[in-house]
Amino acid sequence: MESYKPVWLKGAVILAINLIDKGYKPVAVGLGERDFYIDVKSDTSITLDEVKKAINENVLANVSIENNQIVYKGNKVSIIEDKVSISTNLNPKYFEILNISTHHPNPNEQYVRIRGVAFETEEQLKDYLSWLEKAEETDHRLIGEKLDLFSFHEEAGSGLVLFHPKGQTIRNELIAFMREINDSMGYQEVYTSHVFKTDIWKISGHYTLYRDKLIVFNMEGDEYGVKPMNCPAHILIYKSKPRTYRDLPIRFSEFGHVYRWEKKGELYGLLRVRGFVQDDGHIFLREDQLREEIKMLISKTVEVWHKFGFKDDDIKPYLSTRPDESIGSDELWEKATNALISALQESGLKFGIKEKEGAFYGPKIDFEIRDSLGRWWQLSTIQVDFNLPERFKLEYIDKDGIKKRPVMVHRAIYGSIDRFVAILLEHFKGKLPTWLSSVQVRVLPITDEVNEYAEKVLNDMRKRRIRAEIDYAGETLSKRIKNAYDQGVPYILIVGKKEASEGTVTVRARGNIEVRNVKFEKFLELLITEIAQRDVEQTTVKALK
């Protein structure tokens, strides 16, 4: 979808200009996850027919975009909210308006929000609308509501998610897995505050670069900011005592809560929120250690994606090289870039190159992952940073006794845990692997006469830390089975008089698989192994068949 966004934004600009020509007052043009949006200041609603009349490709020749401003008839209009590079060659002709709604930025104003897409060919539009229809069937927002995982509430604030117990279970499992990965690489976990004086953000540069996303307030004469990043706090921990070359590399990890004030039109379920948790990590190391560190990070990143069932063809790394505006010497950039290239080549992964798309402080590797709907998501990132060590005057004593600057590496594998939950829900269509499922087994007693045995089965599983629950015989058995399937429960254990007398269970799994006369202890043993190994497939039922 990322490749479509420039043409979407160009289409939105064209539509906004036509609306201006018709006397409307667009105040914002931007991009959502799956469409563009235009906010129009209007006391009355705007109909679909009125919007369609405003779609006119003939305006294209008279519109250009300079420095994120629309230039039209000699006037510059500053309503574009996304800094997306837009080629003058883009020629969107085919539009689809997806939604028209109203919202109130304050009690005295009303905005009409128009959402839509635009493409250069009719075939592209048809293909996208067909894909969108399929994607809506697996929308994580609907799955989250259906499975009681999370919710959003206007009274709590837009873009601020509330995870319910079952949703938090999924997050906890993801965090536990990443803790194991971090431990295997030698990370030390830290915890840092959600709020800092803005001095730290001014030194880091975030105060300038992220000012529109920073949440800032004053208390007792000091200015504070809610953190949009974890890196400055990790830097202060590094600076808390002298370091020598023998100490390096130093690796800090944190499941850090960060907050970024995204524009309301850009918010989209868990995919774009204002508060989220990163599986963040920062490494402080010598230049000569960089290549081996990057190799390890690439290897572990691929290991993680394989664990979720993604194949090598579904994993695409990109090397982003030095942009025109950058800091650091040519020699440092060359060393860092060569280290990334060598590490990528030795990984055996095919990688692309994004020329001049590195950060201003250093080159980086971004990983894109393809889901079951064919979408590519940018998730993992490995970024080399010469800038922050310089800004914060970081030092270590080298073996010759001279103070030197360490190199810093930023890395996140999931990226945002909240966003990753959304991607997994859509990728697996709500049927998460057993180890991730909030309810792993549901026990269904056929009649009340076997409730005692059903409860013993339940309690034996819970003693082994299996997330199990029981659905007593209030409904028909077939309806209870359907409910369990619909709610994404991986395993259903059916028990009747025969099972109770023999110490067995009937096992039902996804794909309408049923295995009868299974010794409960055998099932339990296999299930514990499946969960411990974090298998993507239901290996327990495969072993029983």
UniProtKB/Swiss-Prot annotation:
<comment type="function">
    <text>Catalyzes the attachment of threonine to tRNA(Thr) in a two-step reaction: L-threonine is first activated by ATP to form Thr-AMP and then transferred to the acceptor end of tRNA(Thr). Also activates L-serine and transfers it to tRNA(Thr); unlike most archaea the editing function is found in a freestanding protein (ACQ980D1). In vitro when both subunits are present, or if the 2 subunits are fused, L-seryl-tRNA(Thr) is no longer produced, the 2 subunits edit incorrectly charged L-seryl-tRNA(Thr). Has no activity on correctly acylated L-seryl-tRNA(Ser) or L-threonyl-tRNA(Thr).</text>
</comment>
<dbReference type="InterPro" id="IPR004154">
    <property type="entry name" value="Anticodon-bd"/>
</dbReference>
<dbReference type="InterPro" id="IPR045864">
    <property type="entry name" value="aa-tRNA-synth_II/BPL/LPL"/>
</dbReference>
<dbReference type="InterPro" id="IPR006195">
    <property type="entry name" value="aa-tRNA-synth_II"/>
</dbReference>
<comment type="subunit">
    <text>Homodimer. Probably interacts with its editing subunit (AC Q980D1); a subunit fusion (in the order edit-catalytic) is fully functional.</text>
</comment>
<dbReference type="InterPro" id="IPR002320">
    <property type="entry name" value="Thr-tRNA-ligase_IIa"/>
</dbReference>
<feature type="binding site">
    <location>
        <position position="282"/>
    </location>
    <ligand>
        <name>Zn(2+)</name>
    </ligand>
</feature>
<dbReference type="GO" id="GO:0005524">
    <property type="term" value="F:ATP binding"/>
</dbReference>
<protein>
    <recommendedName>
        <fullName>Threonine--tRNA ligase catalytic subunit</fullName>
        <ecNumber>6.1.1.3</ecNumber>
    </recommendedName>
</protein>
<feature type="region of interest" description="Catalytic">
    <location>
        <begin position="139"/>
        <end position="433"/>
    </location>
</feature>
<keyword id="KW-0648">Protein biosynthesis</keyword>
<dbReference type="Pfam" id="PF03129">
    <property type="entry name" value="HGTP_anticodon"/>
</dbReference>
<dbReference type="InterPro" id="IPR033728">
    <property type="entry name" value="ThrRS_core"/>
</dbReference>
<dbReference type="GO" id="GO:0004829">
    <property type="term" value="F:threonine-tRNA ligase activity"/>
</dbReference>
<dbReference type="InterPro" id="IPR018163">
    <property type="entry name" value="Thr/Ala-tRNA-synth_IIc_edit"/>
</dbReference>
<feature type="binding site">
    <location>
        <position position="231"/>
    </location>
    <ligand>
        <name>Zn(2+)</name>
    </ligand>
</feature>
<keyword id="KW-0963">Cytoplasm</keyword>
<comment type="similarity">
    <text>Belongs to the class-II aminoacyl-tRNA synthetase family.</text>
</comment>
<keyword id="KW-0694">RNA-binding</keyword>
<dbReference type="Pfam" id="PF00587">
    <property type="entry name" value="tRNA-synt_2b"/>
</dbReference>
<dbReference type="GO" id="GO:0005737">
    <property type="term" value="C:cytoplasm"/>
</dbReference>
<dbReference type="GO" id="GO:0046872">
    <property type="term" value="F:metal ion binding"/>
</dbReference>
<dbReference type="InterPro" id="IPR036621">
    <property type="entry name" value="Anticodon-bd_dom_sf"/>
</dbReference>
<dbReference type="GO" id="GO:0006435">
    <property type="term" value="P:threonyl-tRNA aminoacylation"/>
</dbReference>
<keyword id="KW-0030">Aminoacyl-tRNA synthetase</keyword>
<keyword id="KW-0067">ATP-binding</keyword>
<keyword id="KW-0862">Zinc</keyword>
<keyword id="KW-0820">tRNA-binding</keyword>
<keyword id="KW-0436">Ligase</keyword>
<feature type="binding site">
    <location>
        <position position="410"/>
    </location>
    <ligand>
        <name>Zn(2+)</name>
    </ligand>
</feature>
<dbReference type="GO" id="GO:0000049">
    <property type="term" value="F:tRNA binding"/>
</dbReference>
<keyword id="KW-0547">Nucleotide-binding</keyword>
<dbReference type="InterPro" id="IPR002314">
    <property type="entry name" value="aa-tRNA-synt_IIb"/>
</dbReference>
<dbReference type="InterPro" id="IPR047246">
    <property type="entry name" value="ThrRS_anticodon"/>
</dbReference>
<keyword id="KW-0479">Metal-binding</keyword>
